[in-house]
Amino acid sequence: MEREYMEFDVVIVGAGPAGLSAACRLKQKAAEAGQEISVCVVEKGSEVGAHILSGAVFEPRALNELFPDWKELGAPLNTPVTGDDIYVLKSAESATKVPNFFVPKTMHNEGNYIISLGNLCRWLAQQAEGLGVEIYPGFAAQEALIDENGVVRGIVTGDLGVDREGNPKEGYYTPGMELRAKYTLFAEGCRGHIGKQLIKKYNLDSEADAQHYGIGIKEIWDIDPSKHKPGLVVHTAGWPLNDENTGGSFLYHLENNQVFVGLIIDLSYSNPHLSPFDEFQRYKHHPVVKQYLEGGKRVAYGARAICKGGLNSLPKMVFPGGALIGCDLGTLNFAKIKGSHTAMKSGMLAADAIAEALAAGRVGGDELSNYVDAFKASWLYDELFRSRNFGAAIHKFGAIGGGAFNFIDQNIFGGKIPVTLHDDKPDYACLKKASEAPKIDYPKPDGKLSFDKLSSVFLSNTNHEEDQPIHLKLADASIPIEKNLPLYDEPAQRYCPAGVYEVVANDDGSKRFQINAQNCVHCKTCDIKDPAQNITWVAPEGTGGPNYPNM
């Protein structure tokens, strides 16, 4: 069909730290060179920041480069880290505090800040618009615009006003637009659905290890002022997880008597009975955590997958007409459990490459090889190289053995131990059969520290237009009941942190698989963990999904 179109020099998909940093850098470079570069950013959330969720302890290295005067400009970095506490939780009641000497250097946070990444992205968007960037929130990029020569020429935004059966709704239908560009940057975050398509189409991961993921579940709490320690960073390993189902937790004291509390579970976990949501709820009852939360009030909830494969799992970064940046590429430094500064730097490097190409009179559609060269010469590459073994060591040797390896690698060899560990088994292939794994009996939530999924999703402010095509696509509708249920007790009912997937009984006693798509918080776990790789997440109508205030 013929669609309306707009033309830009650069289109960026996603208003997260990578996309917004790229946009700002492009405009800065254009101003320095006295040239015009038109830049458009599309964002599927209802506003910038609505879909942003991160810990976040923020390292300002890339921000210092992008806006050296960020303090004067009012960037929302208000809580410097004042201390790091690391515990190994041995059971539901006991814990050992790790002496500072034994903590990997990458886990020290002097000079970093506890922030809301959503609020930082809102601030970056203000800077970008001040520089002349056009930002369009509420518009979901649905697919890449690829010409007959296999060159990416921009994106197509999703149609609006389509009913559940795919038919236009009278009086409401608006076809999506083509946003054409000389170069297109994809900054959709972890497991971006267009990024996934591009990796497959251009075979970008042919020389990379399998990507690895975690699911991060996070809440914001208002706590008793007498328990509040602004700037304190608490990390834990161990209980409620184990060596076959690994992960770790965080609890960060920010300003205004608030804490961020969360649990990250590696999606390589093996027990199909495991529920990341319920593990997080019971984790909050541990004395190390409860001491801060007791008497407080939960005010926000959300979840998001993270890419943690690191350097060994990076796909090729470029293709004709564009590039992957940030978590769409997989630049998170898992040794630091930080991805914001690395995402920003990748966006800035790509922006430099595009500005250079346009200044040289290139008309677009080519491969940005100068982005790849600049990446390999940057501190970003050095960081990812030094942390390349961190996740693989934990997968191979467990939390204790992997922790010992990482201590030696990071503290003695500075991340340059002369061996590279590879972990090429994809996360979805790690599940045991339900009959081979112990069942897990989760305690009922008490409504004070622990809660159920529905009341949690309510706090994410998630909303979707109900009469639209379901954005969680099953390649084969029979697999959930006929294969996943008998083999794995259909793990989707547990790995989803928002109650999207249910196995329900029909009147005749048979079972059916129900998808409550309106609950989806866009975490992407189902797209990653389904053992049959039968679920594909695509973007729903723009503005749909969570509306995180300051996650």
PLM regions and their residue ranges:
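FAD-binding beta-loop-beta segment adjacent to the flavin cofactor pocket
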Residues: 303-334, 456-467, 480-495, 502
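Iron-sulfur cluster-binding cysteine motifs and their immediate structural context
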Residues: 486-518, 524-547
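Predominantly flavin-linked oxidoreductase catalytic cores and closely associated redox partners
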Residues: 118, 122, 127-291, 349, ...
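Active-site-proximal substrate-binding core of FAD-dependent oxidoreductases
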Residues: 330-336, 348, 352-397, 514-516, ...
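Conserved Rossmann-like nucleotide-cofactor binding loop
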Residues: 18, 47, 191
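C-terminal auxiliary extensions adjacent to catalytic cores
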Residues: 394-448
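N-terminal Rossmann-like FAD-binding beta1-loop-alpha1 element of flavoenzymes
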Residues: 10-40
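N-terminal FAD cofactor-binding segment of flavoenzymes
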Residues: 36, 44-93
